[in-house]
C-alpha cells in the first residue's frame, strides 16, 4: 500500500526565520533558515517518519541606491551530494529587485541525518562595496512527514517580482535534471544468447540485462560479448591492403641473407693465405747495411 503524506504537526506549518540584514559578498554566503525544533524532529524520528520540504519561500528586500548595479545569485544545495553535485536550484535577479523566490523539494530525507538543505547567496558584477549591508533575507519553510518516501511530482521553482521596474525578462532560475542511469549488465557465461523475443525470464547463469532489451541496447550488449567470443569476425569488411601482412618471415630472412657478402670456404682460405703471406714479406725483408766510408 502506498504511503500517503500525513498532515504535518502545527510546528511544521511555515516556519519563518528572522528578516536579517546580510553583507554584500562575491563568495557564496549562507542564508540562515529556521527548521523545526529539535523536539519536533525527535517526535517525527520516534515515529520513524521521513521528511521533505513542501514549500520554501525566500524573501529578498534590497536596500541599495537607485544607481546600484549587479546581480544577486541565490542557490539551494543538498549536502547529501558531493560538493560539485549538491546544487539543486538557483535564481538570478537584479540587485535592486525586490522579489520572492519559491522552491519545492522533490525528495525526502532521514531525520537520523542532519538537515541537508543549505541556502546561499552571492553578488556579482556590482558597483556596491563589499561588506555593505545591501539587503534583507527572510525564509519561510513548510515541511511534511511520511512513514516512508514516495515519488514526488516535480514542481519547478518560480519567482514573484515585487518591483514594478523589473519584469520576468530580468530574472532567471533553474533546477537540476534527474540523475542519469545506465544499466550495467552482469557478466555471465551464457550472455551469448541475447535478444530473445517472448516472455522474459532468466535461466541459471544469466542476468536480466542479458535477456531483455530494456536499458542498454541489444546491439551494444551483443557486440561486447561477440567481440570476446569472435574477435576477428568483422575482418572481411576491411580492404585487402589493410589485411596484407607483408612478406613472410622466411622471405625476409632470405632477402637479408642475399644482401650480405658471402664467399666459399676455398675463397676464405685463399684470402687468409694471401694475407699471411703479405704480412711475412713486409716484416721479414733484410735491412740494407750501410757501408762505412
Swiss-Prot record:
Entry GO terms, CC: host cell endoplasmic reticulum membrane; host cell plasma membrane; membrane
Entry keyword DNA-binding: yes
Keywords: DNA-binding, Host cell membrane, Host endoplasmic reticulum, Host membrane, Host microsome, Membrane, Phosphoprotein, Transport, Viral movement protein
Subcellular location, record wording: Host cell membrane; Host microsome membrane; Host endoplasmic reticulum membrane
Keyword Plastid: no
Organism listed in the record: Tomato mottle virus (isolate Florida) (ToMoV)
GO molecular function (one): DNA binding
Post-translational modification: Phosphorylated.
Record-level GO BP terms: transport of virus in host, cell to cell
Membrane topology: Peripheral membrane protein
Pfam families: Gemini_BL1
Coiled coil: none
Domain of life: Viruses
Similarity-based family: Belongs to the begomovirus movement protein BC1 family.
Name listed for the protein in its UniProt record: Movement protein BC1
Assembly behavior: Binds to dimeric supercoiled plasmid DNA.
Function: Movement protein involved in the cell-to-cell and systemic transport of viral genomic DNA. Begomoviruses use 2 proteins to transport their DNA from cell to cell. The nuclear shuttle protein (NSP) shuttles it between nucleus and cytoplasm and the movement protein (MP) probably transports the DNA-NSP complex to the cell periphery and facilitates further movement across the cell wall.
Amino acid at each position: 500500500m502506498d504511503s500517503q503524506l500525513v498532515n504535518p504537526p502545527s510546528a511544521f506549518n511555515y516556519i519563518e526565520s528572522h528578516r536579517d540584514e546580510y553583507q554584500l559578498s562575491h563568495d557564496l554566503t549562507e542564508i540562515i533558515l529556521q527548521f523545526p525544533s529539535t523536539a519536533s524532529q525527535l517526535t517525527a524520528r520516534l515515529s520513524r517518519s521521513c521528511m521533505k520540504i513542501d514549500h520554501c519561500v525566500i524573501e529578498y528586500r534590497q536596500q541599495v541606491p537607485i544607481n546600484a548595479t549587479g546581480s544577486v545569485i541565490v542557490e539551494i544545495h543538498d549536502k547529501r551530494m558531493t560538493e560539485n553535485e549538491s546544487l539543486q536550484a538557483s535564481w538570478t535577479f537584479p540587485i535592486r529587485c525586490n522579489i520572492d523566490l519559491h522552491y519545492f523539494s522533490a525528495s525526502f530525507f532521514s531525520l537520523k541525518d542532519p538537515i541537508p538543505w543549505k541556502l546561499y547567496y552571492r553578488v556579482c558584477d556590482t558597483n556596491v562595496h563589499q561588506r555593505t549591508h545591501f539587503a534583507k533575507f527572510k525564509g519561510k519553510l513548510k515541511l511534511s512527514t511520511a512513514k516512508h518516501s514516495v515519488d514526488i511530482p516535480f514542481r519547478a521553482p518560480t519567482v514573484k517580482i515585487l518591483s514594478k521596474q523589473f519584469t520576468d525578462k530580468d530574472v532567471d532560475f533553474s533546477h537540476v535534471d534527474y540523475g542519469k542511469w545506465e544499466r550495467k549488465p552482469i557478466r555471465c557465461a551464457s550472455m551469448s544468447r541475447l535478444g530473445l523475443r517472448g516472455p522474459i525470464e532468466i535461466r541459471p547463469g544469466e542476468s536480466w540485462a542479458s535477456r531483455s532489451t530494456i536499458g542498454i541496447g541489444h546491439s551494444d550488449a551483443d557486440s561486447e560479448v561477440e567481440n570476446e567470443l569472435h574477435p576477428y569476425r568483422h575482418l572481411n569488411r576491411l580492404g585487402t591492403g589493410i589485411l596484407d601482412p607483408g612478406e613472410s618471415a622466411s622471405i625476409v630472412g632470405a632477402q637479408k641473407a642475399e644482401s650480405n657478402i658471402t664467399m666459399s670456404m676455398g675463397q676464405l682460405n685463399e684470402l687468409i693465405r694471401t694475407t699471411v703471406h703479405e704480412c711475412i714479406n713486409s716484416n721479414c725483408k733484410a735491412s740494407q747495411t750501410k757501408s762505412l766510408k
